[in-house]
UniProtKB/Swiss-Prot annotation:
This is Small ribosomal subunit protein uS12. It is found in: Cytoplasm, Cytosol; Cytoplasm; Rough endoplasmic reticulum. PANTHER family: 30S RIBOSOMAL PROTEIN S12 FAMILY MEMBER (PTHR11652). Residues 1-20 have a biased composition (Basic residues). It comes from Dermacentor variabilis (American dog tick). One of its GO terms (biological process) is cytoplasmic translation. Belongs to the universal ribosomal protein uS12 family. Keywords: Cytoplasm, Endoplasmic reticulum, Hydroxylation, Ribonucleoprotein, Ribosomal protein. Component of the 40S small ribosomal subunit.
Amino acid sequence: MGKPRGLRTARKHRSHRRDQRWHDKDYKKAHLGTRWKANPFGGASHAKGIVLEKVGVEAKQPNSAIRKCVRVQLIKNGKKITAFVPRDGCLNYIEENDEVLVAGFGRKGHAVGDIPGVRFKVVKVANVSLLALYKEKKERPRS
């Protein structure tokens, strides 16, 4: 049997479309409300947090490296996440108990590249851009 055709089939078409929408991954993600439940940021693009410790995450095969990351406890809800520290030597600008600004890391909530389970990256440290510290345009504020 094909789809219903002809007059007076609009209700059937509409309800079928409504049912089939739930099989679309993006529609489901947008309408189920899991953005607020499952996402540590709670639907926001960035979040501030306190650095708990520095960690090295081993890259997935076939690469062999230790990617420099930090464990961060978010201020808004207390959830703990692992955030990647981009660029060479930038881990030296971050100390424990620093306040950092964390953003998403590409791929809409999925891990990126060869770093397993890391979905976030550090953008600012102590309200100073990590890129500015790296390029030596700014210095860390004295604490």
